[in-house]
């Protein structure tokens, strides 16, 4: 599990949109994940508490942004957020728990890694991990709630970077091009080379490729 976190000072006087702050004194963290669907690599989650005094322009669902915009916003989030935390669940955890429970585990780790204790976690999707604080699931939240948008960007960029590093070790799979998703290129490489230790053997295409070489 890789975790990064960042503390900052107190909040200023400006306000965020209503979706981010439900009541005076509420400290909201947005939570999102990247990497539920790929055949390889960890699932990564991020939690972000934005600073009302330092708004970040252009936040959106990471999937709606170009790679260049995600990288720029990643740097701004890291610089301006009150707190952020990025965590993951490993391929081994995905295979032993299943992808849903591994995703919930990564989200829990991200929230617990925050240096600022939130009072409410807003989670992208339709279910919440077990947390010690209140939580709210918001379908499509990564396009609606700025702190969830920020979390989606941190999770996506972090995971993409991880897969680029994996590509250096296993260039035959093309991880730098598809981030582990089941593209035709990736499936062809699986059939030709078989899976590596970073492939999720609980996922059917990987399991089938593994069976071919046994």
Curated annotation (Swiss-Prot):
Protein name: Ribonuclease HII
Biological process, per Gene Ontology: DNA replication, removal of RNA primer; mismatch repair
Cofactor details (free text): Manganese or magnesium. Binds 1 divalent metal ion per monomer in the absence of substrate. May bind a second metal ion after substrate binding.
InterPro entries attached to this UniProt entry: RNase_HII, RNase_HII/HIII, RNase_HII/HIII_dom, RNaseH-like_sf, RNaseH_sf
Pfam families reported for this sequence: RNase_HII
Main subcellular location: cytoplasm
Enzyme Commission numbers on file: 3.1.26.4
Residue ranges annotated for the RNase H type-2 domain, each copy included: 26-214
Transmembrane segments: none
One GO molecular-function entry: RNA-DNA hybrid ribonuclease activity
Residues involved in a divalent metal cation binding: 32-33, 124
Database matches in PANTHER family: RIBONUCLEASE H2 SUBUNIT A (PTHR10954), RIBONUCLEASE HII (PTHR10954:SF18)
GO cellular component, one term: ribonuclease H2 complex
Location in or out of the cell: Cytoplasm
Coiled-coil intervals, chain numbering: none
NCBIfam families: PRK00015.1-1, PRK00015.1-3, PRK00015.1-4
